[in-house]
Amino acid sequence: MPKLEQRFDYVKIGLASPDRIRGWGERTLPNGTVVGEVTKPETINYRTLKPEMDGLFCERIFGPAKDWECHCGKYKRVRHRGIVCERCGVEVTESRVRRHRMGHIKLAAPVTHVWYLKGIPSYMAILLDMPLRDVEQIVYFNAYVVLEPGNHESLSYKQLLSEDVWLEIEDQIYSEDSEIVGVDVGIGAEALQVLLANLDLEVEAEKLREEIANSKGQKRAKLIKRLRVIDNFIATGSRPEWMVLDAIPVIPPDLRPMVQLDGGRFATSDLNDLYRRVINRNNRLARLQEILAPEIIIRNEKRMLQEAVDALIDNGRRGRTVVGANNRPLKSLSDIIEGKQGRFRQNLLGKRVDYSGRSVIVVGPKLAINQCGLPREMAIELFQPFVIHRLIRQGLVNNIKAAKKLIQKGDPNVWDVLEEVIDGHPVMLNRAPTLHRLGIQAFEPILVEGRAIQLHPLVCPAFNADFDGDQMAVHVPLSLESQAEARLLMLASNNVLSPATGRPIITPSQDMVLGCYYLTAENHKLQGSKALYFANPDDVILAYQQDKIDLHTYVYLRLAPDVEIETDKPEEIPPDIQQISDELVVHTYWMPLDSKVLPNTLGELKSEQKCENGDLVKAYNLYRIHYSQEGEIKKVYIKSRQVRQSNGLVTTQFVVTTPGRIIINQTIQSVL
């Protein structure tokens, strides 16, 4: 048997032509018989428990229920591979073909695809340039539509007619003296199929482009919307009439199974009930057409077939929801595909992978931005192959089994080896839902105690994470190529800007902003206290750690004499208040300590004194003064202090600061 695996790059949903639908379901057996059409609503025979022929579980269409065994039992064993049984017509092959072989139901009347009729926007209504309500009235047999107006004066193409109006026109057409010819009206999906088939997409697109050039406002937007749909049809090579179905694909039976429960009862997929309704109504319609039943009965049956197909494709999208036992809505094909528990998100995107784990995240403020804290328990499991390889290479163990025993015992050598292994080996962290590419980023792992993953608070906006119980998944890139890619493209420190807006996504918030504010805040009430002088920032931090000072105590920190301090005005010029418009004016001045303008707030230094070598030196304070509009001094703050020689050369200078500001300054410098 040929391999069933086939590589592909992507999955694309599009319109299938009637020929393609039949091609999915039809197969020619080795003996030349064409099979594939499901004609009976039966599933299995309740006496023999074998699938009914031409039913929803037919072995001739979908393949044998048991490996290498035909329906009647004439051929058994693998030696009969590929033989088609003369009695039952079943090909002898593996039963797993029932997972991918499809069938089809040939419809006695066309039906519309509910996605394209009732979707938002409705592609049928847009293409036909008709209101959705009118299109629905045609599909569900509430109104006629004019397909050919002929030579009738009051009729126009695509005009809607009620039943009474059409009966009057019909009387006119068939009267003896009537000269009206060429009038054709339709109802139901058949009429829509004709209207859609009459569309010449290239001509319509050209017309719309001309109209758009001469239109404005809402009309222009509507025309652009229609042109976009038509261009998409042209680009994909799809035809509008394919939105009306002549045949319905039947998915493989193993994807809608029927299983026997204890006590002889059966549990079945909802799809089987929905398919059964379609087949029953389709067969009934075909019989009514054969016996030439009245038009009103056939029309009603066509409407019921349309509703059955709607329920199969998307139950509840239009009309009443079809329910099963206990008034539970039946799961249609759309329900199986869409949503969090659907095929795509649950089964295709949500697969379990090796070398991954997940745990609760907690804040790791001491981490670098490109680091994450990985619990030891998780790290030893994720990096086990690398650890085992290194243990064997270092000669600590002889084989894999011995290495695993050493790991289980928690030998100290194992943790040393693990530290070596994770050094320079990035891991990827992902937080669901991954709505943009920054939802998964790479970090350098740091081993931590406990069972929670530590995350740097600055990367939280990218993941939309907070620490109220959020979980994150860890993935280990195995190959050297994937490790290099993670390091170069996905490392958190390389993803500073949002790909959507181009603005920084790594922005401090909440506790970080509050912490920065608290560290840099000033308490001016403490300025008048005794001045504390420190030679360097480390001494200030040491005094703070020993509880000699607190975060907001004003301290004089020595600076190198050549460090320039910016001021608003030249030194020793008293404030000159001429015209003030602001409510509060702030200026910064250098003034001697014995200045008459300002009080000597820190009087422990004399303004002028002699040094040991006889040089005359003078002390200056850098004042920050707040004035009112009238020029009255409201507040005075000392910002710096200098000691200068008589020639103006600065010998010593101090800046007034706080331990909190020194801490934040050193923290920022250490990570730059």
UniProtKB/Swiss-Prot annotation:
It catalyses: RNA(n) + a ribonucleoside 5'-triphosphate = RNA(n+1) + diphosphate. The keyword Transcription applies. One of its GO terms (cellular component) is DNA-directed RNA polymerase complex. One of its GO terms (molecular function) is DNA-directed RNA polymerase activity. Mg(2+) binds at D466, D468, D470. InterPro entries: DNA-dir_RpoC1_gamma, DNA-dir_RpoC_beta_prime, RNA_pol_asu, RNA_pol_N, RNA_pol_Rpb1_1, RNA_pol_Rpb1_3, RNA_pol_Rpb1_3_sf, RNA_pol_Rpb1_clamp_domain. Its EC number is 2.7.7.6. The keyword rRNA-binding does not apply. SMART domains: RPOLA_N. Keywords: DNA-directed RNA polymerase, Magnesium, Metal-binding, Nucleotidyltransferase, Transcription, Transferase, Zinc. In cyanobacteria the RNAP catalytic core is composed of 2 alpha, 1 beta, 1 beta', 1 gamma and 1 omega subunit. When a sigma factor is associated with the core the holoenzyme is formed, which can initiate transcription. DNA-dependent RNA polymerase catalyzes the transcription of DNA into RNA using the four ribonucleoside triphosphates as substrates. HAMAP family: RNApol_bact_RpoC1. This is DNA-directed RNA polymerase subunit gamma.
